[in-house]
């Protein structure tokens, strides 16, 4: 269903997976990867957004470390590689690459000019930073790891942001969740949804903590949010 395009930066080019909707022009959504690269899960999410009428694009944000990463969460060796990639990844440069992705897809003939973003895990933190640092029109963060360390940027949060937090997330402990809520609750442009009993990556199909009902609930909330802010 998808295609590959190249995105140009001052440091070089990187690939992105693109899925196009049946009708265009349409609003675009940048899908921000987990620590497993642009794998089948990310491509399926991208395809699914296209099926909902969005021009969806998933950039290879690990390209500066290792281009073309496509691994799963199904083996210890893959987990070790994923964490090594995450540790080598530069978040600040990654946000700049997201802005380059936004610029590229916004200029695509199939885009109507509106661009949102949705990110998962590491991508959840990047989605938060997309809302504070880029000109994306809206962003959704699923179980973002490390956001509690980035809350100094909350003052610059001018874009609509939705967050999905797993109450039992082993990577985002309750203390971190409390800090996030203290900083962001009450902001008119922020919506936070907490999922009781859920662990990290509850919306990752095939994952250890996947929960179909809450994944569907979060997905429906995200789509409604995009419909509101992207049209």
Short names for language-model regions:
Residues 1-231:
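N-terminal cap/leader regions of alpha/beta-hydrolase-fold enzymes
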């Amino acid at each position: 269903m998808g295609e590959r395009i190249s995105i140009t930066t001052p440091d070089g080019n990187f690939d992105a997976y693109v899925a196009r909707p049946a009708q265009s022009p349409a609003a675009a959504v940048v899908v921000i990867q987990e620590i497993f690269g642009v794998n089948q899960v990310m491509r399926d999410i991208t395809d699914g957004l296209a099926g909902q009428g969005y021009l969806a694009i998933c950039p290879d944000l690990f390209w500066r470390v290792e281009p073309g990463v496509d691994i799963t969460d199904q083996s210890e060796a893959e987990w070790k590689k994923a964490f090594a990639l995450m540790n080598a990844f530069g978040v600040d440069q990654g946000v700049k690459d997201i802005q380059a992705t936004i610029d590229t897809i916004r200029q695509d003939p199939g885009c109507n000019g509106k661009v949102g973003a949705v990110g998962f895990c590491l991508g959840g933190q990047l989605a938060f930073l997309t809302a504070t640092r880029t000109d994306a029109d809206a962003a959704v963060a699923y179980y973002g790891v490390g956001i509690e360390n980035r809350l100094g940027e909350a003052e610059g949060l001018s874009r609509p942001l939705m967050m999905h937090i797993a109450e039992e997330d082993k990577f985002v402990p309750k203390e971190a969740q409390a800090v996030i809520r203290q900083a962001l609750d009450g902001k008119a442009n922020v919506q936070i949804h907490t999922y009781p009993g859920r662990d990290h990556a509850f919306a990752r199909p095939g994952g250890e903590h996947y929960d179909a009902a809450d994944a569907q609930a979060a997905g429906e909330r995200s789509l409604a949010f995009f419909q509101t802010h992207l049209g």
